[in-house]
Amino acid sequence: MGAIAAGIAMFGAAIGGGIGDGIVVAKMLEGMARQPELSGQLRTTMFIGVGLVEAMPILAFVISLLVMNK
């Protein structure tokens, strides 16, 4: 039962992370197209945002390992 719960948790986290990354990158590209002179600042902010979005699947992976090994 723990393996099923871990799989569902990882599925949800992967879908959420993928959608979140897509939104962050799309908005960054919109901003770069609108104001090319701010591309450096936007890129830096995008990398921070993608890192925060990717933290969710990593935490879900750790929690799913804990659930499976319980």
Swiss-Prot record:
Cellular-component GO terms for this entry: plasma membrane; proton-transporting ATP synthase complex; proton-transporting two-sector ATPase complex, proton-transporting domain
Site keyed Reversibly protonated during proton transport: positions: 54
Entry keyword set: ATP synthesis, Cell membrane, CF(0), Hydrogen ion transport, Ion transport, Lipid-binding, Membrane, Transmembrane, Transmembrane helix, Transport
GO MF annotations, alphabetized: lipid binding; proton-transporting ATP synthase activity, rotational mechanism
InterPro entries listed in its UniProt record: ATP_synth_csu_bac/chlpt, ATP_synth_F0_csu, ATP_synth_F0_csu_DDCD_BS, ATP_synth_F0_csu_sf, ATPase_proteolipid_c-like_dom, F/V-ATP_Csub_sf
Self-association and partners: F-type ATPases have 2 components, F(1) - the catalytic core - and F(0) - the membrane proton channel. F(1) has five subunits: alpha(3), beta(3), gamma(1), delta(1), epsilon(1). F(0) has three main subunits: a(1), b(2) and c(10-14). The alpha and beta chains form an alternating ring which encloses part of the gamma chain. F(1) is attached to F(0) by a central stalk formed by the gamma and epsilon chains, while a peripheral stalk is formed by the delta and b chains.
Similarity annotation: Belongs to the ATPase C chain family.
Protein name, UniProt field: ATP synthase subunit c
